[in-house]
């Protein structure tokens, strides 16, 4: 350590505290990275990797970025899961003896980003904290850019669905715990010492933060696991932010059962937040419904979709507001135009609280406040009864508007220090400093003209740089003409630079004025932010009201465009949808092109629909559209149908499509059975089940047996009796309607004409005994020979007189004749009593048969 430079020692002292982060070390106008951090930065940011001598014979890898480009480079690292420690110079050069003092002012992690240009405006940036036990979990989340802070305690089986709903950027866990994330989630996992999750430690941290004696007011006094997660989250934020967390002034405890429960598989199958094909917004329900104009509205819509309501009163409030905007097209259009001028007031409020807001953002706030006043004049003075509930928080803030108008210039720069942020007339002393700094250009221009005239040197010029300050530059050819009061300051190749006593005196005056100007402008700006901070809660209330109006008017806009209707709710356990449609498929086809269908499900007489018919005919679409209509209704949206009479549904479950979980070592069939078991164990009589091809991942008879048993269980189990749509290729299941009174058969209508098959996409009563699989294979482009041969084999299989189809050679030379050896081997296999073999014995027998086959050259 004796041979390293003081700067190197300072860096190492800082770096040892942040071993898992890339340290951005401020050196003048650059942030530098060293050693392995530099190699990572050079690779990920595509910047030059160089080196710097930082001790006797010690060259250290180095890569740097300009300080003003921090956000751009920071976003690239954060998006790739890195953590970045921002190490700033906290004293000025010359203020202290020796090195400039440096310290980490903030640790930026994926879940603690607050910079607007690094965030998705319509999506929360959640930091999630989890504390797991064998069968339960404490969960807390926070978005420090919006001040949201919540917690819950839930069954471990519901954890994946809640993680999917929140879609966090980062997850905190105790060091002793681990978590398998769904493949589509890109969250960074951060480990925290288990000490911070201990009940007493976490509780004390929350009590200290909220300055209270107990947590009853926050609803989590009796949720110990939730308290552990929330307290640990606060500790993590305190460590990373290095600043006050006052914006987290409320902890909202909630219960999963307060909302419709949708498991992670159903969220994915129904494509609520992202399409299954491209994993994008397009093709998802969110993509159809998102006609919001504000960032706050976009985030609220996501929350609505993840937490459909269970109280009819709350749903009706939303639907009544949608009614108003649906009927009042001029009001809807006017509001949409106004909302388009609203900035992200929620995040602006928090940046004011954190004192990180830029001057230009205050102008965006000013414009938004003016628009709030206009919206209030339109709706708030005499609130339409159907909107009154959602207008409660909408209050003009003229005092806040006055503060910005009086203090901030209309077109301020992005940074402080030039005297152009604070409005002229706001502070007389600052006006004088601005005048002095502004007069500098005039003075220098006049002095340059005077010196040229007095010396006769026409090429003489005055200039300035940060190293040498102000100077007079004279070319070498004119050096003989310089006056005696010129003092040499710098020698160039073709010129000399000089200073005069007059210029030096003015330089000191100007530089002192600029330094004083920066200090004064910074101080005045902070005073303005302190004043604006007093309106924090009122600003958030306005943001919440605008977000609600935005979402509900967007629902109306979508309904008008797509011909949706208001759903009606009743107390009976039934749903009746007339000419329902799939919202995403319809949008892809174009309005009016989708084949609409009816559905009627009732716990009393038609509890289960067995749906048969060919692939590609629309079975899955029919199942999904029913679930989507139910979900849309319970978030307060109109629905794609001619009429919809619904009951409240507590859970939606889906088992659709084949999926492997290779990371857990589970086959497609095992995944299917696990999901089915979960559904049967947790569904209630108020649930909606959509099940597609249960049992298809195993042998025909095993699959048929499982499918039939599942239907019988749903029908007959007293605690279940869930309304169910059951699509299947097992045509034998249509017989269940003969002895299970609440099972009904429906099928996808097909038209056959001279061997040609046309799928009509209509759902009609009755079962079918054909799958039309070969027709689908033909549409897929299988060779003609294969299609022709498949029809022949199908005919033979359907003829009871012929038990096995004859094998016809397509390429005889590729088919090997049976030999005595193969016959003997076949007989040995046939003679095995598989049921009596243990797994180990079966494996040994398999190896034995394989060895015999290899020895016989088979």
Swiss-Prot record:
Q: Which InterPro entries match?
A: DNA_mismatch_repair_MutS (IPR005748), DNA_mismatch_repair_MutS-lik_N (IPR007695), DNA_mismatch_repair_MutS/MSH (IPR017261), DNA_mismatch_repair_MutS_C (IPR000432), DNA_mismatch_repair_MutS_clamp (IPR007861), DNA_mismatch_repair_MutS_core (IPR007696), DNA_mismatch_repair_MutS_N (IPR016151), DNA_mismatch_repair_MutS_sf (IPR036187)
Gene Ontology CC entries for this record = cytosol
Chain positions recorded as ATP binding sites: 613-620
- Name the domain of life: Bacteria
Task: Mention one GO molecular function.
Answer: mismatched DNA binding
UniProt key word Nucleotide-binding:
yes
Q: Which UniProt keywords apply?
A: ATP-binding, DNA damage, DNA repair, DNA-binding, Nucleotide-binding
Biological process terms in GO annotation? mismatch repair
Name the NCBIfam families for this protein.
mutS1 (TIGR01070), PRK05399.1 (NF003810)
Q: What does this protein do?
A: This protein is involved in the repair of mismatches in DNA. It is possible that it carries out the mismatch recognition step. This protein has a weak ATPase activity.
Family per similarity comment:
Belongs to the DNA mismatch repair MutS family.
Protein name as annotated: DNA mismatch repair protein MutS
- Per the UniProt record, the source organism is Dehalococcoides mccartyi (strain ATCC BAA-2266 / KCTC 15142 / 195) (Dehalococcoides ethenogenes (strain 195))
The gene is mutS
